[in-house]
Amino acid sequence: MRKQKMLFLCTQNSARSQMAEGFLRELAGDRFEAYSAGCEVGNEIHPYAVEVMNEVGIDISDQYPKGLRTYMGKMGFNYSIIVCARAERNCPKTFPGVCTRLVWIFEDPRGEDVPEEERLENCWRVRDQIELKIKNWLEHPEEELAKLKAERERERQERLRAARRARELRSELEEVPAPTRWPRPTAHHGVFVAPG
């Protein structure tokens, strides 16, 4: 059976998407080819991401940050999965060669407002969330696809409502009578005659 290709996307491809790539390769490498990329390209995989993955027996130290251009126009994917909110805003909504786009948002374990002493603990938590999400998806992909279908239908209905409202507003504007144009005042030049 031909393997399906899955691309995980985050902002810099330095933590969440790298962990997701490692988990998918480990859990279902016989069924999927796992890849990851970022909207931007980070300098390196975050050391904590490598550390917490090593703790569960998955070595991602050979992986490295890659940008979307690495794959654009060169490879098709069955799935692209956005794993962070910033990437959802900044990555293209459509990606050439992608059949299905999913959104699984995980918090940034190394966020700027997170104290250094909490970042490793956050990496553990996010790692476990990613593992659980991938395991659930592998066991019940139809549920995720049903949610996606329902979400797309909601978006379609919202677009239809917006288009209908725009038509109604145009129609209402056409029914409004044009403003009455008053004649322009004309200057009267009279001759003043002083009483005599």
Write out the residue ranges for each language-model feature.
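Long, low-complexity, compositionally biased polyampholytic IDRs enriched for Lys/Glu and Gln/Arg
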Residues: 150-175
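Short glycine-rich anion-binding loops that position phosphate/pyrophosphate groups of nucleotides
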Residues: 14, 85-88
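Redox-cofactor binding/interface segments in oxidoreductases and associated redox assembly factors
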Residues: 82-83, 103
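Phosphate-binding/catalytic loops
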Residues: 90-156
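Long, low-complexity, intrinsically disordered segments
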Residues: 174-196
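Conserved acidic residues
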Residues: 78
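Conserved active-site segments centered on acidic
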Residues: 1-71
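A short, aliphatic-rich alpha-helical micro-motif
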Residues: 74-75
